[in-house]
Amino acid sequence: MVQSMTSVVKAANFILARPTLSKIITPLAQKFTAYAGYREMGLKFNDLLLEETPIMQTAIKRLPSELNYSRNFRILTAHQLALSHQLLPAEKAVKPEEDDNYLIPYILEAEKEAFEKAELDNIEVKA
């Protein structure tokens, strides 16, 4: 089941708005992220998102050039590390505070535009 990033953001906001849920889910999410291991490869979470959708392609095209360059560099570095069966040293690995959602605003904007376009394409005019 493919979910839109909008629904994921709404679910995250719902969880974070409730203190009890937030106290339960946040530590679990932090443990899951730590065990995922992508930070030890030099990647940020947004680098792992599926690129082969039109919405993601639009979002990636809208990234500023320095963000796009650093994203490509992180992905190439991770590929090289995977080929050599190595991990980055702890001081070069991505820290949790550096793992920001740099791509999410662009994805949300592209999803909103795609939704509006779909609505306009399917509009029915009643006579």
UniProtKB/Swiss-Prot annotation:
UniProt entry tagged with the keyword Transport: yes
Entry keyword annotation includes Lipid biosynthesis: no
Species: Candida albicans (strain SC5314 / ATCC MYA-2876) (Yeast)
Summary of subunit composition and partner proteins: Component of the ubiquinol-cytochrome c oxidoreductase (cytochrome b-c1 complex, complex III, CIII), a multisubunit enzyme composed of 10 subunits. The complex is composed of 3 respiratory subunits cytochrome b (COB), cytochrome c1 (CYT1) and Rieske protein (RIP1), 2 core protein subunits COR1 and QCR2, and 5 low-molecular weight protein subunits QCR6, QCR7, QCR8, QCR9 and QCR10.
GO CC terms: matrix side of mitochondrial inner membrane; plasma membrane; respiratory chain complex III
Main location: mitochondrion
InterPro entries: QCR7, QCR7_sf
Keywords: Electron transport, Membrane, Mitochondrion, Mitochondrion inner membrane, Respiratory chain, Transport
Function: Component of the ubiquinol-cytochrome c oxidoreductase, a multisubunit transmembrane complex that is part of the mitochondrial electron transport chain which drives oxidative phosphorylation. Plays an important role in the uptake of multiple carbon sources such acetate, lactate, amino acids or GlcNAc present in different host niches.
Stimuli inducing this protein: Expression is repressed by HAP43.
Protein family (similarity comment): Belongs to the UQCRB/QCR7 family.
Underlying gene: QCR7
Membrane topology summary: Peripheral membrane protein
Domain of life: Eukaryota
Subcellular localization: Mitochondrion inner membrane
Any one GO molecular-function label of the UniProt entry: ubiquinol-cytochrome-c reductase activity
Protein's name in the database: Cytochrome b-c1 complex subunit 7, mitochondrial
GO biological process, one term: mitochondrial electron transport, ubiquinol to cytochrome c
Description of the deletion phenotype: Reduces recruitment of inflammatory cells and attenuates the virulence of C.albicans infection in vivo. Leads to mitochondrial dysfunction and shows defects in biofilm formation or the maintenance of filamentous growth. Leads to decreased vegetative growth on several carbon sources including maltose, citrate and acetate.
